[in-house]
Amino acid sequence: IPVEVLAQGAWVLTDPAFVEAVGPESQVEAAVSAVGLDLGDEVVLFPLGPEGPLEGVELRPNRVRVVERREALFLKEVPLSLNPPPGRRLLDYAPKTVRLVGPREALEGLAGVTATLQEALGPGEVEVAVAPDLPPGSIPWDRFGCGLR
């Protein structure tokens, strides 16, 4: 079963990443993960099922070693404001939102992002790539351009 180590603000990689559940068949079949709390370089694991902790299930091994901690990233969808090039008027654009991924500090107070079109575009509908002004450490989750009218 997969190992899940709970750590505040971090994604934890362990060795091993999977452990074996041993015990009564009905309990072992209910095991969905081996869970532990990141308190140091070694983590004690507990078997967990859909209803909570599982009695009578032994994990082999019952401890894992933390091999890496990575900063946790978060996903947030925010409004996208698009400014036309100087001297031009923008009638409409899509998409109106953008999904960003980044550290919590970069995204939690973010109310929206703005992009300014640099190209001088002729009249009509066009597809263009845009580069919004993003907070440090964040990137767009989806590849996107804007359709303009």
From Swiss-Prot:
Say which domain of life the source belongs to. Answer: Bacteria
Q: Which residues are in the YbbR-like domain?
A: 1-68
What's the protein called, per UniProt? YbbR-like domain-containing protein in def 5'region
Lineage of this protein's species? Bacteria, Thermotogati, Deinococcota, Deinococci, Thermales
